């Protein structure tokens, strides 16, 4: 008769249970292989994000309608930028099938990060929603909005150096602490991070682009310098992720047991997305700011020339009458 060790039996029974408990809950609902088609087939329109985006779009269009009724023309380009790559950009990564894979593939999460913190906020700023609201609102709500925009909290949070510090610290705080793993395990935290990325991007880019009348805006040289300082951010961040010897999120992604994705390869792709995408957006915005600076300098030069011409003409007229 073979002797059976009760301790070994207990260990063999307990081990799978412990493994199943520590494995991510998402493993029971692993999505199908990621393809272009799945971006559409895995979309979810029945979410609070969809409701929020539709509500914001409706308010914007209502403001445009009020201006049109009052005889004021609102640029169609601004409306297209706000609704298209602005709100549409947010929807493309939070409502489409990408949201199904944001806790499965780090690379998809990085696409979300880029869109929510850098791309969409730029086009939201170009849509000038605050300017639209100030023109469309009745006097009393307009005064309240101005009070909010110029409040101490708004001034402090949107001050360029403060906004720059938050913009720089945010990605490192997410990916180089336990926060990223926590967002993978808790959907509500994941949603809060998305909201924070949008807000941080708006606070950073809106004063730089200078479309809306926000407090604390710097002159063009200061804006260009601040944008220049942000260019290396995503290079350092992307390379750090690509060259990391540990997986971000710990054992979360390996424990999903995906047969169609390798966590290590996906992490390299994720770092490349941050590196390349961040560099492209930063350099593009820097070029736009330099262009604004040059046009502003040209306008100032023409103004000075006109003033000098008026003074010279006045002196000649005075000399002739004398």
Segments from the language model and where they lie:
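Alpha-helical membrane segments of multi-pass proteins
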Residues: 2-322
């Amino acid at each position: 008769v073979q002797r059976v060790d009760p301790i070994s039996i207990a260990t063999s029974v307990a081990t799978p249970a412990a493994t199943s408990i520590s494995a991510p809950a998402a493993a029971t609902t692993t999505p199908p292989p990621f393809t272009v088609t799945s971006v559409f087939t895995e979309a979810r329109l029945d979410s609070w994000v969809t409701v929020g985006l539709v509500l914001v779009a409706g308010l914007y269009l209502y403001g445009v309608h009020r201006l049109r009724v009052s005889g004021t023309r609102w640029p169609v380009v601004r409306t297209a930028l706000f609704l298209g790559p602005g709100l549409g950009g947010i929807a493309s990564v939070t409502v489409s099938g990408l949201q199904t894979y944001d806790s499965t593939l780090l690379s998809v999460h990085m696409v979300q990060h880029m869109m929510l913190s850098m791309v969409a906020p730029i086009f939201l700023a170009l849509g000038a929603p605050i300017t639209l609201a100030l023109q469309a609102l009745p006097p009393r709500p307009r005064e309240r909005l101005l009070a909010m925009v110029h409040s101490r909290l708004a001034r402090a949070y949107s001050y360029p150096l403060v906004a720059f510090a938050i913009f720089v610290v945010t990605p490192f705080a997410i990916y180089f602490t336990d926060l990223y793993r926590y967002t993978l395990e808790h959907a509500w935290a994941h949603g809060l991070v998305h909201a924070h990325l949008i807000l941080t991007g708006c606070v950073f880019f809106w004063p730089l682009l200078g479309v809306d009348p926000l407090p604390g805006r710097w002159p063009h040289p200061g804006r260009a310098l601040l944008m220049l300082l942000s260019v290396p951010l995503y290079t350092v961040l992307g390379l750090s992720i690509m060259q990391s010897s540990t997986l971000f999120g710990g054992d979360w992604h390996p424990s999903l047991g995906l047969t169609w994705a390798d966590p290590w390869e996906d992490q390299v792709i994720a770092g490349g997305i941050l590196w390349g995408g961040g560099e492209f957006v930063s350099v593009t915005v820097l070029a736009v700011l330099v262009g604004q600076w040059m046009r502003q300098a040209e306008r100032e030069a023409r103004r000075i020339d006109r003033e000098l011409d008026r003074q010279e003409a006045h002196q000649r007229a005075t000399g002739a009458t004398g």
